[in-house]
């Protein structure tokens, strides 16, 4: 490319007192134009190659982002989302395993139930139910023990006392034609005490003296009735 200065209005017959400023004209040679055309496709090809590399890098990044993490099979999520999922899962588990009190009007629930099929009742109403059952049982017993049953109980006691008296009389007297009744333990003890007292020396001497006195009285009576009878 060469720059040539060409004066305006040049010619042999033109003459002016003031000289016009020169105009610069760019003239491109054929070899320079061909070189410029050869450079432009190269630049376009390099730009296309750079764009292709950028797209390939984006695709690789997408593949890396969508791939499974090393720690598990689920996609990465924020801590807030994980906490929300855990809370929802825990709530669903509690709804599946929770039991509501069967007492009418009570809304207390629990998840600590050993047997899911059996009905559950809270501690307050369970104790209340036991107390009501106990009071009802006591009232039924009180109602059943009054009235005719009390009279029947008195009759039973009277019959038992009569039977006891008859059995005691039979033991002491015995029936006709039967052997004598066996003495009771108290009677046996009294008989043993009586025998031991009779065998004591003091009682023996006293009895001997009494016997002698009786003998003397009998002799005196005989002498009075029969004066000449021998003693």
UniProtKB/Swiss-Prot annotation:
One of the record's GO molecular function terms: DNA binding
Extent of motif Nuclear localization signal: 123-138
Principal location listed in the UniProt entry: nucleus
Keyword Phosphoprotein: yes
Gene Ontology biological process terms from the UniProt entry: positive regulation of DNA-templated transcription
Pfam families according to UniProt: RFXA_RFXANK_bdg (PF15289)
UniProt feature, compositional bias: Basic residues: 115-138
UniProt-annotated location(s): Nucleus
GO cellular component: nuclear speck; nucleus; RNA polymerase II transcription regulator complex
PTM statement from Swiss-Prot or TrEMBL: Phosphorylated.
Compositional bias per record (Acidic residues), positions renumbered to this chain: 50-65
Keyword set, alphabetical order: DNA-binding, Isopeptide bond, Nucleus, Phosphoprotein, Ubl conjugation
InterPro entries: RFXAP_C_sf, RFXAP_RFXANK-bd
UniProt crosslink position (Glycyl lysine isopeptide (Lys-Gly) (interchain with G-Cter in SUMO2)): 157
Span list, region Disordered: 1-163
Known role: Part of the RFX complex that binds to the X-box of MHC II promoters.
PANTHER family: REGULATORY FACTOR X-ASSOCIATED PROTEIN
Assembly and interaction partners: RFX consists of at least 3 different subunits; RFXAP, RFX5 and RFX-B/RFXANK; with each subunit representing a separate complementation group. RFX forms cooperative DNA binding complexes with X2BP and CBF/NF-Y. RFX associates with CIITA to form an active transcriptional complex.
Name listed for the protein in its UniProt record: Regulatory factor X-associated protein
Organism listed in the record: Mus musculus (Mouse)
């Amino acid at each position: 490319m060469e720059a040539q200065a060409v004066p305006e209005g040049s010619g042999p017959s033109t003459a002016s007192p003031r000289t016009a400023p020169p105009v610069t004209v760019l003239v491109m040679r054929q070899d320079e134009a061909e070189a410029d055309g050869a450079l432009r496709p190269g630049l376009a090809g390099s730009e296309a190659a750079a764009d292709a590399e950028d797209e390939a890098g984006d695709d690789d990044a997408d593949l890396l982002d969508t791939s499974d993490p090393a720690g598990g099979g689920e996609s990465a999520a924020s801590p807030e989302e994980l906490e929300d999922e855990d809370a929802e899962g825990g709530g669903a588990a509690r709804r599946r395993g929770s039991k509501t009190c069967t007492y009418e009007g009570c809304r207390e629930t629990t998840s600590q139930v050993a047997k899911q099929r059996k009905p559950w009742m809270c501690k307050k109403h369970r104790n209340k139910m036991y107390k009501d059952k106990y009071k009802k049982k006591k009232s039924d017993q009180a109602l059943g023990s009054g009235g005719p049953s009390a009279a029947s109980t008195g009759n039973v006691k009277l019959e038992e006392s009569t039977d006891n008296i008859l059995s005691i009389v039979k033991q002491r007297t015995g029936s006709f034609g039967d052997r004598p009744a066996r003495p009771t333990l108290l009677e046996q003890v009294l008989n043993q005490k009586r025998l031991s007292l009779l065998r004591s020396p003091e009682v023996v001497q006293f009895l001997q003296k009494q016997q002698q006195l009786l003998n003397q009285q009998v002799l005196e009576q005989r002498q009075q009735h029969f004066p000449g009878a021998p003693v």
